[in-house]
């Protein structure tokens, strides 16, 4: 998923953190510059929120809005705001009240999404389908206040042969899809008009056609035989077994890392899940699978961030690695690597490098490949390419036009290429690229 699903209640005027407000540019990972005061405060407050501890950050009046922008970019604003409400109310009462209204809106929307989703899941089960919930609501239950960890969508995994049945149930309940040919894509999005509910119905956990990570599906070929049942607000739901689910959370973050990055919330999900179910997880299997796709150092860095920055103890068979390059990339990426257009555009370089390595080609793709990437590499930015690769020239044209429109200032045209090269070096640093 690469979309921003921001919704407000009807008539809600509150928006202290507009999405168009860019985060400050971060120095790239080779610089080893120390984190800013705001970034340090953000991690300290997030840690306090996760462990229900007190947070007393020393921030100036100018730094409070910056903190909230950073929290919003990672979609953890309710968690951050609640942890520091007394301090921000004293420092800037107007900002505190405006933020409180926005957070209340987010929490109400999440409560509505959760209730509607549980009803939908029950309807699918009653119809004879065998859906599995992944991520989303399963991870939210691990937080001190689940509805303060928002999910813009819910993901459901089904056997491909059950798609027609599930589609029938969902359309009967008022959900609609914009996918022109849902039979041909691995993931079908659904919305219910005048509702915050958004569903992604997966036939596979990863797009099989992707040259960079389509092969990750092999780890979950028999996952339907290892499911577990959870109770959420009185509703029974089925999900992946604990080992499979943690592996999926890690590889889902890894997939986004190969694109344009991922945010701190995904790291929190991984850490909370791994500690909640540590005794039931087959750690040797997790490490073996990660190593098979050269993601073992990446996974180790994720867990090291938890130990050194978020107050978690060691878990699993991971050795300490230098986590700071990954943490710097995470903080500047936003929730799904969508902090800025340069970062989104740069994903074509990193994806091409990984695909080339898996296919035995050189990983140093040239300018031609960067300008005219494959359909698979562009599907994140252009969802309408899924199953319709004949539209690739249109995507190329739109992409080039966007570059020309966005890069009118002198020296800015190479920003995405430069960032792509830097992130390719980051993948090499963690052993993903040779």
Regions found by a protein language model. Name each.
Residues 34-152, 158-434:
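Conserved NTP-donor binding/palm subdomain of two-metal-ion nucleotidyltransferases/polymerases, i.e.
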């Amino acid at each position: 998923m690469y979309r921003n699903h921001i919704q407000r209640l009807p008539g809600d005027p509150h928006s202290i953190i507009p999405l168009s407000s860019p985060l400050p540019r971060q120095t790239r990972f080779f610089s080893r510059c120390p984190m800013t005061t705001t970034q340090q405060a953000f991690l300290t407050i997030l840690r306090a929120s996760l462990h229900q501890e007190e947070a007393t950050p020393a921030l100036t009046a100018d730094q409070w809005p910056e903190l909230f922008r950073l929290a919003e970019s990672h979609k953890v604003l309710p968690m951050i705001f609640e942890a520091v409400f007394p301090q921000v109310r004293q420092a800037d009462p107007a900002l505190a009240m405006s933020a409180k209204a926005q957070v209340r809106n987010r929490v109400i929307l999440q409560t509505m999404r959760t209730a509607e989703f549980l009803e939908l899941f029950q309807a699918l089960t009653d119809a004879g389908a065998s859906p599995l919930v992944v991520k989303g609501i399963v991870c939210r239950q691990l937080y001190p206040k689940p509805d303060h960890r928002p999910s813009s969508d819910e993901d459901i995994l089904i056997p491909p042969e059950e798609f027609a049945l599930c589609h029938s149930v969902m359309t009967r309940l008022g959900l609609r899809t914009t996918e022109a040919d849902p039979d041909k894509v691995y993931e079908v999005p659904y919305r219910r008009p005048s509702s915050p509910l958004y569903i992604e119905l997966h036939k596979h956990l990863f797009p099989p056609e992707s040259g960079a990570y389509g092969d990750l599906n092999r780890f979950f070929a028999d996952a339907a035989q290892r499911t577990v049942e959870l109770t959420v607000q009185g509703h029974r739901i089925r999900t992946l077994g604990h080992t499979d689910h943690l592996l999926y959370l890690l590889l889902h973050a890894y997939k986004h890392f190969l694109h344009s990055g991922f945010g701190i919330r995904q790291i929190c999900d991984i850490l909370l899940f791994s500690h909640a179910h540590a005794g039931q997880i087959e750690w040797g299997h997790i490490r073996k699978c990660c190593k098979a796709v050269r993601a073992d150092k990446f996974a180790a860095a994720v867990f090291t961030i938890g130990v050194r920055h978020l107050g978690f103890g060691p878990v699993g068979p991971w050795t300490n690695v230098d986590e700071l390059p990954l943490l710097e990339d995470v903080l500047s990426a936003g929730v799904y690597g969508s902090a800025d257009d340069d970062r989104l555009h740069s994903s074509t370089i990193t994806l091409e490098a990984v695909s080339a390595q898996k296919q035995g080609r050189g990983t140093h793709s040239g300018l031609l490949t960067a300008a005219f990437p494959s359909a698979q590499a562009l599907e994140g930015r252009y969802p309408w390419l899924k199953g319709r690769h004949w539209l690739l020239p249109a995507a190329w044209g739109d992409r080039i036009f966007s570059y020309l429109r966005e890069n009118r200032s002198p020296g800015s045209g190479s920003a995405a290429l430069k960032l792509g090269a830097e992130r390719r070096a980051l993948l090499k640093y963690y052993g993903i690229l040779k």
